[in-house]
């Protein structure tokens, strides 16, 4: 495999964009209770790519869901971009997620009836952008990710790597300061996985985005500024970092 540029050249900013204090997520009660996330403390400034490694069921996906406001913690404080997510109403939280957090999942959903460009335009239109402005920005993002010849293609006519790049472009449409990626290379072949890893690194290197990735893919350690391991809902530095 070709080596990626090393992450040591990155210069994170001091201000924390993501901050967790004694965060817990418990399912069930009593003796059957499951601590999916158990007392996690974490601070992430702008310009970091944090990789969270761990086996299935370790709590890493639940942790990302808490940071992304997809779940509410049982206890503790989750702050993103200076906002305590626990203090936001459901409507305010949904609006916050739309504008402040970009999500990239292993099993992403693109709308089969829309073109690649229209899929990327969707969050822009939801945020109130004019149709022409949304189209121009979507085309800019797709061209940036090497998809200038695929603007009018529908998902069923794209390769797996191309679809993942469309999903990443859509996640970036509203310039969110935080990107959350759950197994972003999990369904891709080696070459396309490497391309997505390079794009994630580029977001940090060029734009000082804060990127949090949960994955089994150790190739991402080459571009991460920090590598953590999640086991039994707790975070520790990875021993192979």
Enumerate the predicted regions with their spans:
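ABC-family P-loop ATPase nucleotide-binding domain
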Residues: 1-26, 236-241
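ABC family nucleotide-binding domain
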Residues: 15-223, 227-230
């Amino acid at each position: 495999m070709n080596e990626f540029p090393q992450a040591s050249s990155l210069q994170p900013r001091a201000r924390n964009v993501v901050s967790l204090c004694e965060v817990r997520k418990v399912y069930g009660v009593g003796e059957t209770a499951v601590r999916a996330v158990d007392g996690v403390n974490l601070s992430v400034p702008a310009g970091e790519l944090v990789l969270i490694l761990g086996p299935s069921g370790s709590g890493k996906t639940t942790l990302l869901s808490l940071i992304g406001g997809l779940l509410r913690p049982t206890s503790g404080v989750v702050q993103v971009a200076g906002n305590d997510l626990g203090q936001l109403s459901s409507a305010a939280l949904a609006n916050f997620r739309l504008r402040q957090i970009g999500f990239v999942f292993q099993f992403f959903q693109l709308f089969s009836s829309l073109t690649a460009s229209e899929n990327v335009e969707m969050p822009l239109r939801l945020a109130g952008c004019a149709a022409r402005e949304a189209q121009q920005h979507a085309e800019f993002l797709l061209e940036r990710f090497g998809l200038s010849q695929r603007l009018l293609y529908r998902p069923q006519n794209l390769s797996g790597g191309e679809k993942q790049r469309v999903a990443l472009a859509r996640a970036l449409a509203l310039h969110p300061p935080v990107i959350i990626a759950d197994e972003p290379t999990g369904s891709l072949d080696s070459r396309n996985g490497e391309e997505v890893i390079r794009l994630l690194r580029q977001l940090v290197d060029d734009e000082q985005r804060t990127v949090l990735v949960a994955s089994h893919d150790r190739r991402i350690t080459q571009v991460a500024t920090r590598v953590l391991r999640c086991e039994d809902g707790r975070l520790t530095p990875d021993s192979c970092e």
